[in-house]
């Protein structure tokens, strides 16, 4: 087919004329033409559709410097941030060559994982925001009110600022879930409510008709621990009472250790109680002998409990010791607030001496101290190291307290009532405030981590994902015996405990066994005589002695060397050997 001709007449309308040529032979088609013959004929007559022109190839890109680009090298700090001990693996310490090769493969796999994680971290392009005044305006940031911030941000962020005015039942204590999605509030006069604070969906609301000292979420939003007048109660997400923990009496503060499933309560009679909520068993309970324990927090890095006392000291507790692991003199007056960051590196304390002090938990040394105009009661630390302090009816938020660059407050908000509780929302730029007039959700730009770690806690998890996470948490549960100041101790072998168990086992060799005391049950209508009763006693005693002798024989084999055995197999005895 020849090309299409286009012509433009004087009227301005395009006209298209198409001409066709007949390629049939003049004599006609005598035989049936094959596909290959038809293809050759089409190419010969010029009507082929195949484009004989070669494809244009893209010219090779040449580097201006004349050499290939080198891959970006990761810095040592980026690799150390994600290193979990791969450099400490020594394949040469293995005995056999097969084990050495396996350990080399394992070490290479760990190193590749570290590099992949460090490279993926570069793709986290979300940055934290902050509040800054205009260049022409020389006003300070703490003069900006919450109303101005809510009008400047997007609609989704503006809805996160709200207030619940409940002056009849306050003051309130609050708590958020680990993923920051759900909120529970408890008033001193018995008001209790739980809700999804982002969608404002109310789970339940009721009055327990008793004084509420503190509230705490357990491993999911379906379980809520409430410290009431006498005992601690556990409710579900519908407000139904599930348990009454009478071992936690007169509790003032509550903390939950998610990796150990331990609910910790500090009572007004100086007792510290640990309860395993997965099995409902009390793990430890001891008197601290330090007065009322109304100031308490946990170190998320190692699950150590920090308590503040009226003599200005802060004590660090573990369920494995009835004495404090560390005792620090933090203030010259009573301690009113304690907070530890998520990494477990810094601790903030406040006291009646109008001081807010920042401590290095790793060295137990004070880094900085800041003077405030009034006595500070509560304190909280966000994921990005913003420190919030409750000063009477006001809440002051500071930036850079841990590195000494803080000179004035970052934000200030008047709550209209005495502040009793502060909680930063994980993964959000929001600070929850419980006060005498109700609850306030305060916007704090730059407080939360913008890159959500869904493996750690997912704010958008579904019901099936929540159930799966709950099962994984139970499978990965850490025993309370492993709680210590150094969280890396969980990767080591407890040689002292192993030696102690071995010594206890060896005592069976030289300690006199205790007399077996067994009294068979008396049957009223039994026809057995007295000697049969004694026979039953002897059978049970002989069985106990036999088990003990077998255990003693096994220990003797381990402790003492086994007798030498000849290499030659013993010959079978023949009946005529007696005649030799």
UniProtKB/Swiss-Prot annotation:
Region (Disordered): 34-108
Keywords assigned: Nucleus, Repeat, rRNA processing, WD repeat
Gene Ontology biological process terms, A to Z: maturation of SSU-rRNA from tricistronic rRNA transcript (SSU-rRNA, 5.8S rRNA, LSU-rRNA)
Pfam families reported in the protein's UniProt record: BING4CT, WD40
Compartment annotation: Nucleus, Nucleolus
Matching InterPro entries: BING4_C_dom, WD40/YVTN_repeat-like_dom_sf, WD40_repeat_CS, WD40_repeat_dom_sf, WD40_rpt, WDR46/Utp7
Mutant lacking the gene: phenotype: RNAi-mediated knockdown results in induction of glutathione S-transferase gst-4.
Keyword Amino-acid biosynthesis: no
WD repeats: 193-234, 235-272, 274-312, 315-354, 357-396, 399-436
Extent of Basic and acidic residues compositional bias: 64-85, 98-108
GO cellular component: nucleolus; small-subunit processome
Oligomeric form and interacting partners: Part of the small subunit (SSU) processome.
Function: Scaffold component of the nucleolar structure. Part of the small subunit (SSU) processome, first precursor of the small eukaryotic ribosomal subunit. Required for 18S rRNA processing. Plays a role in negative regulation of detoxification genes by inhibiting protein levels of transcription factor skn-1, leading to down-regulation of skn-1 target genes.
Name listed for the protein in its UniProt record: WD repeat-containing protein 46
Lineage start: Eukaryota, Metazoa, Ecdysozoa, Nematoda, Chromadorea
């Amino acid at each position: 087919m020849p090309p299409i001709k286009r012509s433009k007449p004087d009227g301005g309308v395009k006209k298209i004329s198409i001409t066709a040529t007949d390629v049939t032979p003049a004599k006609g088609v005598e035989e049936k033409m094959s596909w290959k013959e038809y293809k050759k004929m089409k190419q010969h007559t010029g009507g082929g559709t195949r484009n004989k022109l070669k494809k244009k190839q893209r010219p090779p890109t040449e580097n201006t410097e004349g050499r290939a680009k080198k891959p970006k090298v990761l810095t040592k700090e980026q690799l150390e941030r994600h290193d979990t001990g791969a450099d400490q693996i020594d394949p040469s310490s293995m005995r056999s060559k097969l084990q050495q090769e396996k350990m080399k493969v394992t070490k290479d796999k760990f190193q590749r994982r570290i590099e992949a994680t460090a490279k993926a971290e570069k793709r986290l392009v979300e940055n934290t925001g902050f509040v800054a005044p205009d260049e022409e305006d020389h006003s300070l940031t703490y003069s900006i009110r919450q109303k101005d911030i809510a009008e400047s941000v997007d609609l989704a962020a503006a809805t996160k600022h709200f207030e619940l005015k409940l002056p009849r039942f306050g003051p309130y204590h609050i708590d958020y879930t680990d993923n920051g999605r759900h909120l529970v509030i408890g008033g001193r006069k018995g008001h209790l409510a739980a809700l999804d604070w982002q969608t404002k969906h109310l789970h339940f609301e009721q009055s327990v008709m008793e004084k509420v000292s503190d509230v705490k979420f357990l491993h999911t939003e379906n379980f809520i621990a409430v410290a009431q007048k006498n005992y601690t109660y556990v409710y579900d997400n519908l407000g139904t009472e599930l348990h009454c923990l009478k071992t936690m009496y007169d509790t003032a503060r509550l903390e939950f250790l998610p990796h150990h499933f331990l609910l910790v309560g500090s009572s007004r009679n100086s007792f510290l109680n640990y309860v395993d909520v997965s099995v409902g068993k009390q793990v430890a309970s001891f008197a601290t002998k330090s007065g009322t324990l109304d100031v308490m927090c946990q170190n998320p890095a190692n699950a150590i409990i920090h308590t503040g006392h009226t003599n200005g000291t802060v004590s660090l507790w573990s369920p494995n010791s009835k004495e404090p692991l560390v005792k620090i003199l933090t203030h010259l007056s009573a301690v009113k607030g304690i907070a530890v960051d998520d990494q477990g590196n810094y601790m903030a304390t406040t006291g009646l001496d109008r001081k807010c002090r920042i401590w290095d938990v790793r060295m137990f040394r004070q880094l900085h101290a800041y003077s405030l105009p009034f006595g500070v009661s509560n304190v909280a630390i966000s994921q990005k190291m913003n420190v919030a302090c409750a000063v009477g009816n006001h809440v002051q938020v500071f930036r850079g307290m841990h590195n000494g660059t803080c000179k004035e407050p970052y934000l200030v908000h008047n709550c209209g009532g005495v502040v009793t509780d502060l909680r930063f929302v994980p993964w959000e730029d929001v600070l929850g405030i419980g006060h005498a007039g109700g609850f306030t959700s305060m916007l704090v730009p730059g407080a939360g981590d913008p890159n959500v770690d869904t493996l750690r806690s997912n704010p958008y998890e579904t019901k099936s994902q929540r159930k799966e996470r709950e099962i994984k948490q139970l499978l990965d549960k850490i025993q309370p015996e492993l709680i210590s100041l150094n969280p890396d101790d969980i990767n080591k072998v407890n040689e002292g405990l192993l030696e102690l168990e071995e010594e206890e086992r060896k005592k069976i060799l030289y300690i006199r066994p205790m007399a077996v005391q067994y009294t068979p049950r008396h049957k009223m209508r039994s026809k057995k005589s007295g000697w049969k009763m004694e026979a039953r006693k002897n059978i049970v005693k002989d069985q106990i002695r036999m088990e003990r002798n077998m255990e003693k024989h096994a220990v003797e084999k381990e402790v003492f060397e086994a007798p030498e055995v000849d290499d030659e197999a013993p010959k079978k005895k023949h009946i005529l050997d007696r005649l030799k």
